[in-house]
Curated annotation (Swiss-Prot):
Keyword Transmembrane among record annotations: no
Single GO molecular function: protein-L-isoaspartate (D-aspartate) O-methyltransferase activity
Organism the protein comes from: Pectobacterium atrosepticum (strain SCRI 1043 / ATCC BAA-672)
This protein's name: Protein-L-isoaspartate O-methyltransferase
Biological role: Catalyzes the methyl esterification of L-isoaspartyl residues in peptides and proteins that result from spontaneous decomposition of normal L-aspartyl and L-asparaginyl residues. It plays a role in the repair and/or degradation of damaged proteins.
Gene it is expressed from: pcm
Length: 208
């Protein structure tokens, strides 16, 4: 039954323009039902966002795939994730690169994500309880930064932690949000707009 649901989801993602086979293989390998509440397990392979508690959500699989594809990852990419959340996006990244650094503002979510990743034998992840606006400077610079909550503007600390040639993908805005791709080239930042999106806000400075 689960296999059929995964096949249906992968077919939907392909129809929506996701082409990276390595990414699709990672999505197939990560059991999304392990990252949602028991009450939502039957919806785990629907292409929809789901609540995970503390006012946060697990992003819809299409958005996870789209944002990950935009990062243009190689196995050697040094990756920073802002907003560990359930750990689902983290797990996808962990299948694609040698190591992932992930920052989560809410301690309970960080602990749960860490436990889930360990249960799935994904040991190439470092998580930290901290303010996503500040990134993780001591582990930088990064080739790729993915932000899974929306700041009203691009955080300066994250721009500083993006390496030359690096790519950052994030939603930006308050009431209306736009998915943006930021590339660092010759010390300058080139910003491209992708599409309108809806994410929870990236809360600044306030740990929970």
């Amino acid at each position: 039954m689960v296999n059929k649901r995964i096949e249906t989801l992968l077919a939907q993602l392909r129809q929506q323009g996701i082409e990276d086979e390595r990414l699709l293989t990672a999505i197939e390998a990560v059991p999304r039902e392990r990252f949602v509440d028991e009450a939502f397990e039957h919806k785990a392979y629907e292409n929809t966002a789901l609540p995970i508690g503390s006012g946060q959500t697990i992003s819809q699989p299409y958005m996870v795939a789209k944002m990950t594809e935009l990062l243009n990852l190689t196995p050697e990419s040094r990756v920073l994730e802002i907003g560990t959340g359930s750990g689902y996006q983290t797990a996808i990244l962990a299948h694609l690169v040698q190591h992932v650094c992930s920052v989560e503002r809410i301690k309970g979510l960080q602990w749960q994500a860490k436990r889930r990743l360990k249960q799935l034998d994904l040991h190439n992840v470092s998580t930290r309880h901290g303010d996503g606006w500040q990134g993780w400077a001591s582990r930088g610079p990064f080739d790729a930064i993915i932000v899974t909550a929306a700041p009203p503007e691009i955080p300066q600390a994250l721009l500083e932690q993006l390496d030359e040639g690096g790519v950052m993908v994030l939603p930006v805005g308050e009431q209306s949000q736009i998915l943006q791709v930021v590339q660092r080239h010759a010390g300058e930042f080139i910003i491209k707009t992708v599409e309108a999106v809806r994410f929870v806000p990236l809360v600044k400075g306030e740990l929970a």
